[in-house]
């Protein structure tokens, strides 16, 4: 078979490496000296030639011999690949291997050369002063002491301790070329070793070698943190791998982790030594973890001969979180047991756990341990309650909470068992009651009574000594159907004794006919208890103890044995020498007196022989403990001559000093709450307890209750003056003991009390029936309440127009302070509706911390409300909380925000509606001054000064109502609170409207706006329609839900075709969309115009268009209203200053209006008020009242007046601002022209505008026109003439009493005649005390549309 050329080439290529290896091995360099060992002497010359097939090189020993200066490598003539090594003057340290090799080091020829030097027989390494020998356990170690002379006699010396080792031919040997070989365990103790050789009896030493023991054992490898570790994205990961080894061990660390390829981690190693342990720490760090870093981190350590590894697992969360798992809502345990209630949750980072009991923080003690589990050992009844655990994330302060109820079940305890059971007999035929008082938690479902005939039970005196039940009754029968041996009846009731609820079961025996044993048994889930009562019936024989049953030493008492003198004779008293009949389960009298020898006869006297009975009285004086025991009365039956005995046990107690059980604790409480303090005292005789407050004796009074023998002190409706030092003093015959505690009362004072509530309630109820009678007689339909009650809707805003997100996110809501239960809210009739919500009148039970209910207004969303609308109402709630509490602001009372029902905002209810409607309704009753009788005029001189003083006090009272952030359901402080002497003032509807009222309304609105400004809030829609009238002439500002923080968004702009109240808006607001506090001052000036025009619409007859806005900016202003004074009109002009900075502040307005109010009252006292001429004429002609407007008229009345009071010398508010840089207002200003007085002409606004200046849709305008056609406006003759536009505005005003105009969409207005107004006021003056009962469950009333 022939092979092709290709196949031959392939075979040759495969065999090439084999031939190359053989060629290399055969082609080793050759030396000129053909020996493996060459011996020469010192100072000789070493000359060796090396030849090869390629270039050759020489290597020689690297000893301390300065060989480079004496050695030369040169070429030779034998060939191109030949080199000669020449070493001159050789020395002993030149001993070693000399090698000739090719450049690839694959082939070499070696010759070992001894340079014999007997004066230095050991080779010294280069630079070695001290050598190091590394020793490993259980290994053979070589000490490299090489010899320059062959066949030396060498030994190894070790220090310390000193020891010499010589070669034994086995484990210990010496080799010239290698050194001294010895097992490591023989020299591991040594600090140093060296070799020693003897030549001609002289010893030569090698260099000294330090012995270094090298270990390998790894004791452990730990990871910190270990197991499962949690981190959040962005946090730092630090993982320590710690290795503990024996000494002289080197460790090599290897890490494996998820992001090892990205090399995002840094690793640092550290080693320390402590004692016999060496510690290595390798730290892996990732500065900012991400989700890709999740996984297992493994650390491996190697010492060469030993390996070990460990790992930790890291979980990376995207953000911190807390997830609370489902837990039990009710936990039950038995009295004295131990319970552990764990909190099941997942969260990162580990949250902080805080525990609360009944709303108060609890701390750990010897019986309560806290953490992620609540552990209670040896539970007592005090441990029961509502527990709340609050988990707080320390990073983002996220909280999760869980509340559960801990019930401590108490086995039934029958109180009578703890007392000494009396050994009494019961008279035949008498009615008796046997009682079992049971305390148990939970209360026993039922208390069962059993009975057994006395003769059917056996009595064992031996069991008495053991404290066991001495009665053995086998046939206990349940008492039923009124049968229990005797005619019986079972009664059961629940009582509260010393703060504990107990069940009292009473077995009433109608007629004691049969002696029997009765047993009561109570059972609950924690256990059961029973009491056995001996019921022994006697005929004509009984024992009484006088004066009481509990006796102490040195008392006097008497035992009276009474018997039927026709049945018994020979009565005598004896005393038993031993007590045999008394048991803890009830005593059994001795039925027959058989053992009279055991009795000691006592001297007694017959005290009563009258009638059918005879009484033998045993008198015991100054008794001692020895007088206690069983006393027996023996009587002999006259007919049968048998003896009958009755036993009475007398217990004498040793007097004990009073002893307090526990101590009183200092308390801090809020005004209006209830304090209950228990002073538990033991002592014999029972101590008498007296309470003191600040060292003065405390007696029961209104709100102060003493019960349980004065042990319990209860202070209801705590007031400020109830604070102080309270002392409980307990005294008996041996002395006294006292306990003290200091009570602190905090919070604002509420001056209401029970007596005032009863008085006002009675008066209001009487008024209610009187008004009901008037309504029946007059039969006039009630005015539409929608005009008066819908203003509460104002804060429910269009979420598309107002950015409420910031409100919701930044303003807090504290549910613990503001949340009100829905089941305590009874919804009533609707008050009004808006585009997004509705307002319902409701009764709130207990919202003001009392047991009564209060009428409130509740804001709700309509059905199908969107999430944005829900957030808008929530935003309004938070704004109300942020604004706080003030007398002249519609205040928040509470809210219902919890899931399970609609969102509700509870605010104050103002029954008289908005100020605009009220002023219009009172036009026919307006008088500029108060009417005074002749009797008043006679005493005018004395009274005039009192008016100013009284008003000043009222102003101070009102202005002292400082703002505060309300902390819960606190009842509004009205004028009746700060002015108690005015509590019985007449109803607003019965009083005429006066100039003083108008100024007072203005003053109060200014005061409320001053408060809102102090809270950094801007109203932006201040108008009479947004001012509500409450009791006692108090006005309250509403519709500040759009108020904004002036430091957060001062340039807020409402976009789109929203309806804006242009007539009330300042020029800078109209043109620049800038809302500030000073723009609210402009609106306040317009509000003053409304007030002093008695509710007319501003800018009468003026078309609200671009021309109006231009003229307003140029300085044109409204004319003076019909009922104003020069001072008030000048104040309006000051508020309408074109430069916002020149307008007065609300604080300045408060001061100015307060002064005007005082001045007006002084003028009122003088029957002098300056009014426009038209008003004066109307008053004189129509009412028959004269106004003294001249000095002559003043003299007729013998009064003083100032005829200089007129427009020309009127000063504005600037006179009240000293140092003001603001210029005075001009005396005259340009005003808008009035329309002619044509009352029959119907004026309709063009371009879909209403009097408010709001842009209306055409559909709304048509509705307004239809309403206007239906409404007629009657006026009394007392009302002054007005423009046609003012008349029209009363019927077409776009706002209603409780609802701003641009929120209302389905309400109309009605202005009543004087007769209608009187009836309306009578109907509105409903009783102030709620006419409601406690609601069972929350059930929203249906909201019906109000009639148009």
From Swiss-Prot:
Report, as the record phrases it, the tissue specificity of this protein. In all endothelial tissues during onset of vascularization. In later development, present in lung, heart, intestine and skin.
Q: Where is the Protein kinase domain?
A: 825-1155
Q: Record's Gene Ontology CC terms?
A: anchoring junction; early endosome; endoplasmic reticulum; plasma membrane; receptor complex
The entry's ATP-binding residues are: 831-839, 859
Q: List the disulfide bonds.
A: 50-100, 145-195, 241-299, 436-520, 561-633, 679-728
Question: Which InterPro entries does the record match to this protein?
Answer: Ig-like_dom, Ig-like_dom_sf, Ig-like_fold, Ig_I-set, Ig_sub, Ig_sub2, Kinase-like_dom_sf, Prot_kinase_dom
Where would you find this protein in the cell?
Cell membrane; Cytoplasmic vesicle; Early endosome; Cell junction
**What keywords is this UniProt entry annotated with?**
Angiogenesis, ATP-binding, Cell junction, Cell membrane, Cytoplasmic vesicle, Developmental protein, Differentiation, Disulfide bond, Endoplasmic reticulum, Endosome, Glycoprotein, Immunoglobulin domain, Kinase, Membrane, Nucleotide-binding, Phosphoprotein, Receptor, Repeat, Signal, Transferase, Transmembrane, Transmembrane helix, Tyrosine-protein kinase
Top-level taxonomic group: Eukaryota
Query: Carbohydrate attachment sites?
Result: 43, 47, 63, 93, 138, 153, 201, 240, 290, 310, 365, 386, 513, 556, 603, 613, 622, 666, 688, 710
Q: Which residues lie on this side of the membrane: Cytoplasmic?
A: 778-1348
GO annotations under biological process? Answer: angiogenesis; cell migration; cellular response to vascular endothelial growth factor stimulus; endothelial cell differentiation; positive regulation of angiogenesis; positive regulation of cell migration; positive regulation of protein phosphorylation; protein autophosphorylation
Tell me which EC number(s) this protein carries: 2.7.10.1
Q: Which residues form a coiled coil?
A: none
Q: How does it sit in the membrane?
A: Single-pass type I membrane protein
Q: Which reaction does it catalyse?
A: L-tyrosyl-[protein] + ATP = O-phospho-L-tyrosyl-[protein] + ADP + H(+)
Single GO MF annotation: vascular endothelial growth factor receptor activity
Q: What induces it?
A: In vitro, it is induced by basic fibroblast growth factor (bFGF), uniquely in the first 24 hours of cell culture.
Ig-like C2-type domain location is 43-106, 138-202, 220-312, 320-405, 412-534, 540-651, 658-744
Show the stretches that span the lipid bilayer. Answer: 757-777
**What PTMs does it carry?**
Autophosphorylated on tyrosine residues upon ligand binding. Autophosphorylation occurs in trans, i.e. one subunit of the dimeric receptor phosphorylates tyrosine residues on the other subunit.
> Is Transcription regulation tagged as a keyword?
no
In the record, the note on similarity to other proteins reads: Belongs to the protein kinase superfamily. Tyr protein kinase family. CSF-1/PDGF receptor subfamily.
Function per UniProt = Tyrosine-protein kinase that acts as a cell-surface receptor for VEGFA, VEGFC and/or VEGFD and plays an essential role in the regulation of angiogenesis and vascular development. Promotes proliferation, survival, migration and differentiation of endothelial cells. Promotes reorganization of the actin cytoskeleton. Binding of vascular growth factors leads to the activation of several signaling cascades. Activation of PLCG1 leads to the production of the cellular signaling molecules diacylglycerol and inositol 1,4,5-trisphosphate and the activation of protein kinase C.
UniProt comment concerning the protein's domains: The second and third Ig-like C2-type (immunoglobulin-like) domains are sufficient for VEGF binding.
For this entry, the protein name equals Vascular endothelial growth factor receptor 2
Question: Which organism's genome codes for this protein?
Answer: Coturnix japonica
Q: Name the lineage.
A: Eukaryota, Metazoa, Chordata, Craniata, Vertebrata
Q: Which gene encodes it?
A: KDR
């Amino acid at each position: 078979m022939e092979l092709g050329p290709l196949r031959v080439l392939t075979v040759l290529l495969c065999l090439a490496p084999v031939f190359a290896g053989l060629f290399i091995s055969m082609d080793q360099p050759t030396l000129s000296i053909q020996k493996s060992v060459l011996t020469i002497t010192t100072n000789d010359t070493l000359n060796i030639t090396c030849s090869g097939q390629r270039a050759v090189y020489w290597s020689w020993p690297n000893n301390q011999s300065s060989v480079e200066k004496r050695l030369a490598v040169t070429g030779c003539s034998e060939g191109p690949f030949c080199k000669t090594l020449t070493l001159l003057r050789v020395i002993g340290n030149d001993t070693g291997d000399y090698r000739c090799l090719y450049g690839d080091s694959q082939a070499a020829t070696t010759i070992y050369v001894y340079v014999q030097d007997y004066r230095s027989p050991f080779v010294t390494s280069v630079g070695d002063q001290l050598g190091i020998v590394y020793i490993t356990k259980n290994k053979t170690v070589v000490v490299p002491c090489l010899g320059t002379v062959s066949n030396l006699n060498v030994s190894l010396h070790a220090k310390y301790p000193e020891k010499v080792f010589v070669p034994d031919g086995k484990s210990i040997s010496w080799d010239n070329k290698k050194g001294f070989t010895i097992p490591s365990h023989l020299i591991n103790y040594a600090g140093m070793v060296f070799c020693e050789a003897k030549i001609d009896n002289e010893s030569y030493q090698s260099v000294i070698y330090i012995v270094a023991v090298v270990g390998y054992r790894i004791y452990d490898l730990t990871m910190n943190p270990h197991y499962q570790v949690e981190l959040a994205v962005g946090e730092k990961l630090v993982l320590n791998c710690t290795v503990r080894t024996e000494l002289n061990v080197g460790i090599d660390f290897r890490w494996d982790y998820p992001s090892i390829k990205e090399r995002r981690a840094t690793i640092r190693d550290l080693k320390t030594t402590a004692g016999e342990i060496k510690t290595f720490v390798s730290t892996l760090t990732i500065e900012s973890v991400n989700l890709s870093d999740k996984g297992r981190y493994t650390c491996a350590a190697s010492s060469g001969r030993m390996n070990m590894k460990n790992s930790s697992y890291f979980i990376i969360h995207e953000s911190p979180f807390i997830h609370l798992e489902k837990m039990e809502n009710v936990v039950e345990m038995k009295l004295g047991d131990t319970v552990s209630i764990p909190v099941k949750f997942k969260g990162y980072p580990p949250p902080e756990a805080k525990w609360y009991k009944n709303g108060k923080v609890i701390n750990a003690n010897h019986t309560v341990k806290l953490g992620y589990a609540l552990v209670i050992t040896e539970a007592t009844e005090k441990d029961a309650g509502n527990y709340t655990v609050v988990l707080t994330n320390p990073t983002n302060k996220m909280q999760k909470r869980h509340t559960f109820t801990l019930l401590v079940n108490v086995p039934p305890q029958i109180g009578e068992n703890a007392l000494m059971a009396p050994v009494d007999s019961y008279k035949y035929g008498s009615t008796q009651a046997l009682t079992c008082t049971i305390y148990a938690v939970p209360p026993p479902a039922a208390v069962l009574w059993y009975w057994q005939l006395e003769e059917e039970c056996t009595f064992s005196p031996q069991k008495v000594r053991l404290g066991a039940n001495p009665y053995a009754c086998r046939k206990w029968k349940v008492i039923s159907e009124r049968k229990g041996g005797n005619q019986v009846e079972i009664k059961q009731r629940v009582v509260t004794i010393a703060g504990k609820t107990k069940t009292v079961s009473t077995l009433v025996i109608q007629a004691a006919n049969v002696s029997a044993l009765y047993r009561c048994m109570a059972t609950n889930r924690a256990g059961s208890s029973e009491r056995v009562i001996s019921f022994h019936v006697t005929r004509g024989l009984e024992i009484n103890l006088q004066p009481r049953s509990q006796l102490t030493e040195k008392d006097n008492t008497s035992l009276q044995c009474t018997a039927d003198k026709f049945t018994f004779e020979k009565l005598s008293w004896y005393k038993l020498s031993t007590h045999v009949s008394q048991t803890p389960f009830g005593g059994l009298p001795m039925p027959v007196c058989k053992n009279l020898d055991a009795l000691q006869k006592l001297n007694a006297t017959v005290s009563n022989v009258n009638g059918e009975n005879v009484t033998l009285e045993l008198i015991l004086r100054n008794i001692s403990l020895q007088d206690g025991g069983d006393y027996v009365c023996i009587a002999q039956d006259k007919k049968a001559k048998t003896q009958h005995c009755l036993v009475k046990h007398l217990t004498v107690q040793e007097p004990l000093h009073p002893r307090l059980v526990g101590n009183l604790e200092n308390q801090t409480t809020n005004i209006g709450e209830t304090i209950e303090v228990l002073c538990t005292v033991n002592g014999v005789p029972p101590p008498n307890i007296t309470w003191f407050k600040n060292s003065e004796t405390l007696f029961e009074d209104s709100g102060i209750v003493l019960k349980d023998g004065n042990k319990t002190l209860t202070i209801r409706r705590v007031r400020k003056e109830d604070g102080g030092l309270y002392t409980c003093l307990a005294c008996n015959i041996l002395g006294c003991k006292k306990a003290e505690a200091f009570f602190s009362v905090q919070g604002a004072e509420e001056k209401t009390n029970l007596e005032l509530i009863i008085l006002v309630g009675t008066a209001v109820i009487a008024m209610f029936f009187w008004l009901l009678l008037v309504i029946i007689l007059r039969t006039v339909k009630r005015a539409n309440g929608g005009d008066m009650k819908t203003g509460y809707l104002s804060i429910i805003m269009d979420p598309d127009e107002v950015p409420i997100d910031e409100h919701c996110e930044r303003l807090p809501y504290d549910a613990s302070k503001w949340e009100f239960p829905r089941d305590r809210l009874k919804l009533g009739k609707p008050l009004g509706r808006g585009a997004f919500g509705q307002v319902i009148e409701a009764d709130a039970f207990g919202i003001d911390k009392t047991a009564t209910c209060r009428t409130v207004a509740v804001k709700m969303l309509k059905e199908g409300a969107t999430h944005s609308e829900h957030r808008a109402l929530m935003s309004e709630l938070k704004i109300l909380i942020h604004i706080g509490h003030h007398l002249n602001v519609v205040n928040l009372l509470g809210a219902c925000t919890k899931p399970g029902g609609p969102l509700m905002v509870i605010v104050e209810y103002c029954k008289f509606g908005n100020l605009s409607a009220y002023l219009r309704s009172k036009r026919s009753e307006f008088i500029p001054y108060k009417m005074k009788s002749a009797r008043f005029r006679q005493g005018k001189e004395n009274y005039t000064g009192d008016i100013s003083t009284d008003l000043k006090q009222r102003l101070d009272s009102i202005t002292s109502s400082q703002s505060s952030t309300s902390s819960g359901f606190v009842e509004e402080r009205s004028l009746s609170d700060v002015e108690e002497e005015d509590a019985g003032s007449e109803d607003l509807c019965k009083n005429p409207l006066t100039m003083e009222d108008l100024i007072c309304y203005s003053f109060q609105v200014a005061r409320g706006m001053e408060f809102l400004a102090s809270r950094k809030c801007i109203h932006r829609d201040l108008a009479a329609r947004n001012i509500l009238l409450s009791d006692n002439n108090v006005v309250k500002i509403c519709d500040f839900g759009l108020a904004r923080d002036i430091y957060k968004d001062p340039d807020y702009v409402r976009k789109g075709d929203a309806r804006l109240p242009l007539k009330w808006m300042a020029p800078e607001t109209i043109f620049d969309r800038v809302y500030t506090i000073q723009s609210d001052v402009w609106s306040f000036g317009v509000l003053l115009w409304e007030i002093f025009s008695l509710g007319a619409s501003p800018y009468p007859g003026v078309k609200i268009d671009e021309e109006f806005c231009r003229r307003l900016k140029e300085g044109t202003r409204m004319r003076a209203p019909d009922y104003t004074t020069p001072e008030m009109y000048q104040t309006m002009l000051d508020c309408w200053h074109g430069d916002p900075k020149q307008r007065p502040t609300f604080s300045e307005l408060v001061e100015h209006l307060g002064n005007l109010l005082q001045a007006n009252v002084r003028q009122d006292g003088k029957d002098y008020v300056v009014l426009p001429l038209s008003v004066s004429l109307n008053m004189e002609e129509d009412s028959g009242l004269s106004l003294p407007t001249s000095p002559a008229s003043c003299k007729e009345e013998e009064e003083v007046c100032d005829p200089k009071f007129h427009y020309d010398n009127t000063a504005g508010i600037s006179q009240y601002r000293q140092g003001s840089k603001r210029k005075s207002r001009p005396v005259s200003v340009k005003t808008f022209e009035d329309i002619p007085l044509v009352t029959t002409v119907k004026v309709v606004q063009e371009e879909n505008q209403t009097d408010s200046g709001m842009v209306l849709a055409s559909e709304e305008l048509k509705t307004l026109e239809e309403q206007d056609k239906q409404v007629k406006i009657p006026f009394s003759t007392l009302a002054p003439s007005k423009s046609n536009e003012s008349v029209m505005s009363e019927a077409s005003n776009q706002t209603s009493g409780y609802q701003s105009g641009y929120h209302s969409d389905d309400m109309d207005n009605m202005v009543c005649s004087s007769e209608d107004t009187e009836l309306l006021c009578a109907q509105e003056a409903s009783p102030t005390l709620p006419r409601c009962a406690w609601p069972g469950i929350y059930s929203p009333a249906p909201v019906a549309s109000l009639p148009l």
